[in-house]
Amino acid sequence: MIEADRLIQPQIQAQDESIDRAMRPKMLDEYTGQDDTRAQLKVFIQAAKNRNEALDHMLIYGPPGLGKTTLAMIVANEMGVNIKSTSGPVLEKAGDLAALLTNLESGDVLFIDEIHRLSPVVEEILYPAMEDYQLDIMIGEGPAARSIKLDLPPFTLVGATTRAGALTSPLRARFGIPLRLEFYNIKDLSTIVTRSAQVMELDIDAEGAFEIARRSRGTPRIANRLLRRVRDYAQVKHDGAVTKFVAEHALDLLDVDSEGFDYMDRKLLLAIIDKFMGGPVGLDNLAAAIGEERETIEDVLEPFLIQQGFIQRTPRGRIATARAYQHFELIKPE
């Protein structure tokens, strides 16, 4: 299994939570990047406020670490309502969801992270709640059991997932606002790094922020994590200020290279190049070659490598691109 503490892992780590919370923007105007999504949300939120209605149900999907939870909180702040947060695996029984729904006030946001992992029995309860703001509850057991309907206040369900394709069709169809988050460009990440440094009261120049941003794999969570580690290096080895020189040396020490790759990324790419002559190679063979599960490759390692043009998916398997060979200063065979 892949190590849970990879520095450039986009999934949240225990030490991220409290620090990320302090760095999160609170309103849309403070939110950097995702321009199309931000523009859409401004329209939808203003329209709902003008009509004095709850915002339509929203599905936010995309790779981990891009700000799905942050966006859900911003939606609640912009609407001026409360937010209750949970996750799909936590809602094991219908009663778990019913307890949350019955405590919502009019217009509130219910945020369910990893919504693709909801159990079928919980999902069934969610359908009438989303469509009709009604909760169907079974009272009693056996032959004496009967169903009663409870009216719920209008609310907004915000679901977040890294695997939109894993949602059932009936659930996916009930979201009126689907929003896909993309990897961030370096310019926007530099802005995020600079803002986070200000929150941390850390002296950083534009080149230092850029160097951290370009090694952050298009992911704000990784950028903030790298910033904290570069800060440590700057305070111990230098005068505490983060320059390009300091950032380069700190990240080289941390084994995060110029493309934001760590040893696992290099291991995957070199396996395709060396063991399978550049590909194509099937996912199962590749997983066996590097000692990882196929889901880890698909969900954790591959997305960024494909998006950046280092791996190509074909019907016959994965292929290392010319850019992958260039990264390792190798010549791609004809």
From Swiss-Prot:
SUPFAM superfamilies (UniProt xref): P-loop containing nucleoside triphosphate hydrolases, Winged helix' DNA-binding domain
Keywords: ATP-binding, Cytoplasm, DNA damage, DNA recombination, DNA repair, DNA-binding, Hydrolase, Nucleotide-binding
Region called Large ATPase domain (RuvB-L), residue ranges: 4-184
Sequence similarity: Belongs to the RuvB family.
Organism, as annotated: Shewanella baltica (strain OS223)
Region: Head domain (RuvB-H), residue numbers: 258-334
Enzyme Commission numbers on file: 3.6.4.-
Record-listed DNA binding positions: 294, 313, 318
Known role: The RuvA-RuvB-RuvC complex processes Holliday junction (HJ) DNA during genetic recombination and DNA repair, while the RuvA-RuvB complex plays an important role in the rescue of blocked DNA replication forks via replication fork reversal (RFR). RuvA specifically binds to HJ cruciform DNA, conferring on it an open structure. The RuvB hexamer acts as an ATP-dependent pump, pulling dsDNA into and through the RuvAB complex. RuvB forms 2 homohexamers on either side of HJ DNA bound by 1 or 2 RuvA tetramers; 4 subunits per hexamer contact DNA at a time.
Gene Ontology cellular component annotations, sorted alphabetically: cytoplasm; Holliday junction resolvase complex
Disulfide links within the chain: none
Catalytic activity, as annotated: ATP + H2O = ADP + phosphate + H(+)
Protein name (database record): Holliday junction branch migration complex subunit RuvB
Subcellular location: Cytoplasm
DNA repair listed as a keyword: yes
Annotated spans, Small ATPAse domain (RuvB-S): 185-255
